[in-house]
């Protein structure tokens, strides 16, 4: 992302920039750990809310026919389904893309994993990381003409990093765009994917991706759905 694009997005009042120093190591502070426990509890509680939409928490687009765009997404800690409910920006992001290009043009596939706090502490759930890798490889093999978009929120961003580190050159070449929300590893590359194809959305004061602040800014990434969709549309 260039400063020019950052400036443009600011003009349309869409927050998409890192406004505080990123985490520079993978050792989490006690405040980060307690914040993630708080976030996980809120996300789990949202499942029982009368306003929750559990049906939106699961996407299995790879079970259908190939579509021009395949989006693979991993939920955050404490969330349900395979793309998340609660504070997940995933469903809002998918909706923006479907509205822009048509539901028949995009298949969304979630990554199933435990998404507990322990997974966050070990750098991203190992089984989830493997599932992410397997799903990406499947998408590339199953749909050779599709463009692949990958993303994740919170711990889902961690397992996106973990999977991408193991992508083959062929798989990496098929990645059209990456969008990560509240990424604990926001300063680290996404495998060998070109930085120009990666959008890191990290809110000021989000302790999970900046190392300072608190948990509340980590719960508001759904408001960045329009920005995330625009980034992808500019690259497909």
UniProtKB/Swiss-Prot annotation:
The 2 disulfide bonds play a critical role in holding the catalytic residues in juxta-position; reduction of the disulfide bridges results in the complete inactivation of the enzyme. Its main location: secreted. Residues 1-20 form the signal peptide. It catalyses: cutin + H2O = cutin monomers. It is an enzyme of class 3 (hydrolase). The active site is at residues 154, 206, 218. PROSITE patterns: CUTINASE_1 (PS00155). GO terms for cellular component: extracellular region. Disulfide bonds join 66-143, 202-209. The record marks 155 as: Transition state stabilizer. One of its GO terms (biological process) is carbohydrate catabolic process. It is found in: Secreted. The keyword Secreted applies. SMART domains: Cutinase (SM01110). One of its GO terms (molecular function) is cutinase activity. InterPro entries: AB_hydrolase_fold (IPR029058), Cutinase/axe (IPR000675), CUTINASE_1 (IPR043580), Cutinase_monf (IPR011150). Keywords: Disulfide bond, Hydrolase, Secreted, Serine esterase, Signal, Virulence. Its EC number is 3.1.1.74. Catalyzes the hydrolysis of complex carboxylic polyesters found in the cell wall of plants. Degrades cutin, a macromolecule that forms the structure of the plant cuticle. Allows pathogenic fungi to penetrate through the cuticular barrier into the host plant during the initial stage of fungal infection. This is Cutinase.
